[in-house]
A protein has these predicted regions:
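Conserved PLP-enzyme active-site core in the AAT-like
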Residues: 2, 13, 73-270, 278
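Conserved N-terminal alpha-helix of the aminotransferase class I/II PLP-enzyme fold
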Residues: 34-88, 104-112
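Conserved glycine-rich beta-strand-loop-beta hairpin in the small C-terminal domain of fold type I
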Residues: 47, 261-262, 278-287
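A common structural junction motif
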Residues: 231-232, 303-311, 364-369
């Protein structure tokens, strides 16, 4: 399989013909931690499973093709992937970071900077090129963006920010979790590195914890591979298999997620209980604000079909309360100043019949008085 195929075909065929000896269509799960050698210097290409595993390699090769990268890397979580990227740098290096970045990313960057003299995060509105450029100093080494951002759904111009990064000799890192390569390919727009919480849309079934890095450039890929092997937070063979299996339907799922999200965003804008709806008109994620903070818990207790849970991107619809879940580690005054208010709810719109989702929301809204 080569990049001449469309993304739909690459996804549908993920893992097929990966075992020429047996012809297995489903990727085999290789649980072995060690691999025999025929003699000194006669490796099969696999030595120790932390370094390389046949099942994980299928996933890594596939995501590299999907994102048009030179190499892919699979980790035990999205946060493990970000930790590996942080290890490419050292204090007093700085990253410019989206101001409403995912709370887990904020927590890791904040802790590492304050306690381990790690990379310093500098938070700006990355939707503004002027703000990004104004924040660049002699210590700036990378720009890290989410687009759309989590949870305010702010979009960034990846191509223009990538030009700015190259102008200042900075690495451009894009978290593409929300859009996936089905809807966006940041490496094609000039980014150097793409990361994913593969737990979300790529695996897609709320049953595997996955982090992914896809990079361009031999030297950069070699550095990431060295840290991946040394740190060892690699994805297990079984989770690799689950992810390959799940991603086969990614194109179909993203279309349904997006169609449902567009309909739900329009529906929410018509409801008197809603103050605002944040939706970039692409993807399956949106956020909305209720008009009264006191309604939040009643609403979350009233939904029946939709699950109040702290994740996204699965087949089921989830609503998350950032104030006490994803962004709880950000001090309240700082969190609210960034726009992550106590009335804000994040909605991962699932694959259910959209009329059933609307009905569940409507019955929950009737409880708000």
């Amino acid at each position: 399989m080569t990049q001449q195929y469309s993304i739909d075909t690459l996804l549908a065929q993920a893992g097929n013909r990966s075992d020429e000896r047996t012809g297995a269509v489903s990727t085999p799960i290789y649980l072995s931690t060690a691999y025999g050698h025929h003699g000194i210097g006669e490796s099969t290409g696999f030595d120790y499973t932390r370094t390389k595993n046949p099942t994980r390699s299928v996933l890594e090769d596939t995501v590299a093709k999907l994102e048009n990268g030179d190499r892919g890397f699979a980790f035990s979580s999205g946060m493990a992937a970000i930790q590996v990227l942080m290890n490419l740098f050292k204090g007093p290096d700085e990253w410019i970071v989206s101001s409403d970045v995912y709370g887990g990313t904020y927590r890791l960057l904040d802790f590492a900077y304050k306690n381990n003299n790690s990379v310093k995060p500098v938070y700006v509105n990355t939707a503004s090129l002027a703000e990004i450029e104004a924040a660049i100093t002699a210590n700036t080494k990378a720009i890290f963006i989410e687009t759309p951002s989590n949870p305010l759904m702010e979009e960034c111009d990846v191509a223009e920010i990538s030009k700015l990064a190259k102008k200042h000799n900075l690495l451009m890192i894009v978290d593409n979790t929300f859009l996936t390569p089905v809807l966006s390919r940041p490496l094609d727009l000039g980014a150097d590195i793409v990361i994913h919480s593969g737990t979300k849309y790529i695996a897609g079934h709320n049953d595997s914890l996955v982090g992914l890095i896809i990079a361009k450039g031999q030297e950069l890929c070699d550095r990431i591979a060295y840290i991946q092997n040394g740190a060892g937070a690699v994805l297990s063979p079984f989770d690799s298999w689950l992810t390959v299996r799940g991603m086969k339907t990614l194109s179909l799922r993203m279309k349904r997620h997006q169609d449902n999200a567009k309909a739900i965003a329009e529906f929410l804008r018509e409801q008197p209980q809603i103050d605002s709806v944040l939706y970039p008109n692409k993807g399956g994620m949106l956020s909305f604000r209720l008009k009264d903070e006191n309604w939040v818990n009643t609403f979350l207790k009233s939904i029946k079909l939709i699950t109040f849970a702290e994740s996204l991107g699965g087949t089921e619809s989830f609503i998350t309360y950032p104030a006490t879940q994803t962004h709880m580690d950000i001090p309240e005054a700082e969190r609210v100043a960034r726009g992550i208010t106590n009335t804000l709810l994040r909605f991962s719109v699932g694959l259910e019949d959209v009329e059933d989702i609307k009905a569940d929301l409507l019955q929950a809204f009737t409880q708000l008085k």
